[in-house]
Amino acid sequence: MNTYAFNRELRLLTPEHYQNVFQQAHRAGSPHFTIIARNNKLSHPRLGLAVPKKQIKTAVGRNRFKRLARESFRNNQHQLPNKDFVVIAKKSAQDLSNEELFKLFDKLWHRLSRPSRG
């Protein structure tokens, strides 16, 4: 049976982890947020979040976006490849409903799960 926890091992924790993702990364984006991915040598995917105050002004909005991103990742982690993902919010993300955000996350997770053509 699959577990759907979001443990510490599923998170990007240090600045070095984030910098590694930004080098040689694959991107999938929308007008509302971008997901950057890079292969890792682990047996599971990991998630990092970047939600700048400049993009989403209120703490409530930033926390909502992060909560929904983590929940979407947690629910899809068993279908995702072994990559490190960084989700970067854009200003218009705060205007979407929870359902719209989940649909968009699912679409981008699926796009990043496909094998590369390169």
UniProtKB/Swiss-Prot annotation:
Nuclease among keywords: yes
E.C. code: 3.1.26.5
InterPro entries, sorted: Ribosomal_Su5_D2-typ_SF, Ribsml_uS5_D2-typ_fold_subgr, RNase_P, RNase_P_CS
A GO molecular-function annotation: ribonuclease P activity
Domain of life: Bacteria
Annotated catalysed reactions: Endonucleolytic cleavage of RNA, removing 5'-extranucleotides from tRNA precursor
Keywords: Endonuclease, Hydrolase, Nuclease, RNA-binding, tRNA processing
Keyword tRNA-binding recorded: no
Alphabetized Pfam families for the sequence: Ribonuclease_P
GO cellular component: ribonuclease P complex
GO BP annotation list: tRNA 5'-leader removal
Subunit structure as annotated in this protein's UniProt entry: Consists of a catalytic RNA component (M1 or rnpB) and a protein subunit.
Similarity comment: Belongs to the RnpA family.
Protein's job: RNaseP catalyzes the removal of the 5'-leader sequence from pre-tRNA to produce the mature 5'-terminus. It can also cleave other RNA substrates such as 4.5S RNA. The protein component plays an auxiliary but essential role in vivo by binding to the 5'-leader sequence and broadening the substrate specificity of the ribozyme.
NCBIfam families given in the database record: rnpA
Stated name of the protein: Ribonuclease P protein component
Protein species of origin: Vibrio campbellii (strain ATCC BAA-1116)
Gene name for this UniProt entry: rnpA
